[in-house]
Amino acid sequence: MVKLGCSFSGKPGKDPGDQDGAAMDSVPLISPLDISQLQPPLPDQVVIKTQTEYQLSSPDQQNFPDLEGQRLNCSHPEEGRRLPTARMIAFAMALLGCVLIMYKAIWYDQFTCPDGFLLRHKICTPLTLEMYYTEMDPERHRSILAAIGAYPLSRKHGTETPAAWGDGYRAAKEERKGPTQAGAAAAATEPPGKPSAKAEKEAARKAAGSAAPPPAQ
């Protein structure tokens, strides 16, 4: 062990009394330590770096967003609350529009037909007719409805309301056909050997014309 106040400059062969003067000039190897040197005094003020005071480097600024700018933009809490409310209103209006379109496409056209009728292929069809054709042959019913839908409306109205001159023409034609049909029936009932009354009248008329006297000169 090293003793206090000893130096390596001394030699073991010399007297310790002669070494006292040399020991006074030499520096001791180990000196007593002060307790105040072991623990430094605590500072009165502690500086803490915050986010605003801390400066990020260029690569760090690209990774992290500008939080301070976002805070300045949303400084008012009311504006931040208005954004979700506006989105909810827009979503509700879009949903309401979709519901109205579905209502128009599915149920609204059905109300245009009167009671007891059903809308099929944009035509009001009676429910009894619908049930009848459905029980018989559904495919035939569909083809009939398709043909009715393809038929022009002008032709439909023409067949439903015939003109007055058509009725008069049919009546005159039936009157002309009536006497000829009656004569043919009478000729069929008479015997083949007996001449008809019409033939007798024509023969008498010819005989009277030939027997008439010539006019006086």
UniProtKB/Swiss-Prot annotation:
Protein keywords: Cell membrane, Cytoplasmic vesicle, Endocytosis, Glycoprotein, Membrane, Transmembrane, Transmembrane helix
Q: For the region Disordered, what residue ranges are annotated?
A: 1-25, 162-217
UniProt-annotated glycosylation sites, renumbered to this chain: 73
Post-translational modifications reported in the UniProt record: Glycosylated.
Instruction: Tell me where in or outside the cell this protein is found.
Output: Cytoplasmic vesicle membrane; Cell membrane
- Topology check: give the Extracellular ranges: 1-87
Superkingdom field = Eukaryota
Q: Name one process (GO BP) from the record.
A: positive regulation of endocytosis
Spans through the membrane: 88-108
Gene Ontology terms, MF aspect: clathrin light chain binding
Note the topology in the membrane.
Single-pass membrane protein
Q: Name one GO cellular component term.
A: postsynaptic endocytic zone
Q: Which residues lie on this side of the membrane: Cytoplasmic?
A: 109-217
Q: What is its main location?
A: membrane
Q: In which tissues is it expressed?
A: Expressed in the pyramidal cells of the prefrontal cortex, in hypothalamus and in caudate nucleus. No expression in spleen. Up-regulated in the prefrontal cortex of schizophrenic patients with nearly twice the levels of non-schizophrenics.
Function, as annotated = Interacts with clathrin light chain A and stimulates clathrin self-assembly and clathrin-mediated endocytosis.
Subunit and partners = Interacts with CLTA.
Family, per entry: Belongs to the NSG family.
This chain belongs to the protein called Neuron-specific vesicular protein calcyon
**Gene source species:** Homo sapiens
